[in-house]
A protein has these predicted regions:
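Flexible "cap/lid" subdomain of the alpha/beta-hydrolase fold that forms the substrate-access gate
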Residues: 2-149, 157, 169-176
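Catalytic histidine-centered segment of alpha/beta-hydrolase-like enzymes
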Residues: 152-165
Length: 176
């Protein structure tokens, strides 16, 4: 299977984000560094109070908890309470800080870039805007990238869903 087009929201390439870590990024994305700690500490702390963990991560962004419907929050909490969920989340973040970085660097060293059209959008009030040149970073690892800043924080889909659809749908539906 092949990815034909990709929309990325409020993210820079992971290798660039780790290499460019500064105080502002570390404070905003503290959970990245918490989740990569060895088992079982992060899992135990998350599982002890999933609702508080969600509020600590999601509520710490510029919009707080306001963008999230109560039903959506309840579903996040339900899923985070399921056995194995915290382990899976931590495993994903641990991989992003280890083997994924090795693979990303190997691709860069080999001159391998993403070739599908990419549209990256990030929030004007978020850490990506404050800490990275997202468009430039994606252009280093992909051949066809467009991007823009949107009037929101990190949770683009929840904060400005109509604007996101107006931006993403024409791009995704463009047959070339």
């Amino acid at each position: 299977e092949r990815v034909e087009r990709m929309v990325l929201l409020d993210i820079a390439p992971t290798l660039a984000m780790y290499r460019g870590t500064n105080e502002a990024f570390a404070r905003s994305y503290w959970h990245w560094f918490f989740l990569i700690r060895p088992q079982p500490l992060p899992e135990m702390l998350i599982q002890s109070d999933p609702a508080q963990y969600l509020k600590s991560v999601m509520g710490a962004r510029s919009a707080g908890m306001a963008p999230f419907f109560p039903e959506a929050l309840a579903e996040y909490e339900r899923c985070l309470s399921l056995p194995g969920t915290a382990t899976g989340i931590c495993g994903d973040y641990r991989a992003s800080a280890s083997i994924d970085l090795e693979h990303d660097q190997a691709d860069i060293d080999a001159g391998i870039k993403l070739t599908c059209p990419i549209k990256v959008m990030w929030g004007a009030e978020g850490a990506i805007e404050a800490c990275f040149d997202a468009l430039s970073e994606w252009q280093k690892v992909a051949t066809d990238v467009k991007g823009k800043t949107l009037p929101c924080g990190h949770y683009i889909a929840e904060e400005i869903p109509e604007i996101l659809l107006d931006e993403a749908l024409p791009f995704l539906l463009d047959a070339g």
